[in-house]
């Protein structure tokens, strides 16, 4: 996938993560979700039309169409987030879509690794598969406590899977980045997410007792 567009994907992941963390009101995230969602859809359509103009798939190669599929996967996510927020829609359908998107992302991971032989992008797609799975847990399950870890994961991945790779790609350095460093960064993010999930689950199962901070009650003396 052309990583230039992921400068803006990084921005959307950051904003949506902050929404899940409670730092940004949901309605204020609508414009950026709409704009980036529409831009990614337009880019995907352009790739498809260009590939068709080049002739049969063997001549054009499989990579452009896989890129278009990836753009549409993210585009539908952001557009659905925007529409749900505008209409006050309940988010379980988006959550189940994210489970499907996680499965597709896993397939694209294998394609990038085994067919297109691009291990750098394979690592990123593996990370996005985990991100979509986290969104499924946050939106389609009764585990409300999983929303904050999912938000933190989105914020971290906005940097490690989108912004930094996109900027490196613009500078022409992405392909030269050590694969071990790329893999290590994504592994570290997933470990942090797992730790947050365990912590939030413990808090949900064993909530801390409320601490009384007001004045002591006055009792009548005998």
Language-model-detected regions and their locations in the chain:
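Membrane-interfacial loop-to-transmembrane-helix junctions in polytopic alpha-helical membrane proteins
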Residues: 1, 24-28, 59-66, 90-93, ...
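N-terminal topogenic module of multi-pass integral membrane proteins
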Residues: 1-63, 173-180, 193-222
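C-terminal ends of transmembrane helices
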Residues: 14-25, 78-90, 135-145, 194-201
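Small-residue-rich segments of transmembrane alpha-helices in multi-pass membrane proteins
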Residues: 37-43, 99-108, 152-165
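Juxtamembrane "helix-exit" motif on the non-cytosolic side of transmembrane helices
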Residues: 49-54, 110-116, 166-172
